[in-house]
Amino acid sequence: MNEPSKGGAKTVKLAERRVFSQSFKPLYQEGMGLVEQAAEYLDGKGRAEAKKLSRLAATLYAAESMRLTTRLMQVASWLLLQRAANSGEMTRDQVASEKSKVRLDTASAHDDAAGWGELPADFLDLVTRSLRLQALVRRMDDEIYGAGAVLDMQPVARRTNPVSDQISLLNTAFARG
């Protein structure tokens, strides 16, 4: 937990203290709560709201809901691994090995993407909250496991890449069948 530095002082890693202590519970509950809220929304109100969208916005909604689900499942996996280490079910080395399978870099379309303004407010709130949670978890992961644990240090929020956005929309549109 503490690393020796020059002069004999020890560096305290706040993220490590938070993750491997009782103060991890609120973060875990927040993450799992967001997973549950997103699932309820997407299976209920979100499904009804998506039917009211234009074709373009509906395609964007479908792509973003997949990104949202992927992002939340990756964050949930990370949280579950940390909880397992915290409760003694796994060693930190086991967690470090398993967490290499977890990706904390699921981006979202840029908010000026065509159709973004039509997306339901509740859905956009879930996307924003999931991006914030992912960014927090990613920073904690980087502090605990080192900068090498995260390959792409570019902020994840909403990357502007019009070509990628259009390819994603086309893939979603033609995958409907």
Predicted regions located by residue number:
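Surface-exposed peri-terminal alpha-helical interaction modules
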Residues: 2-177
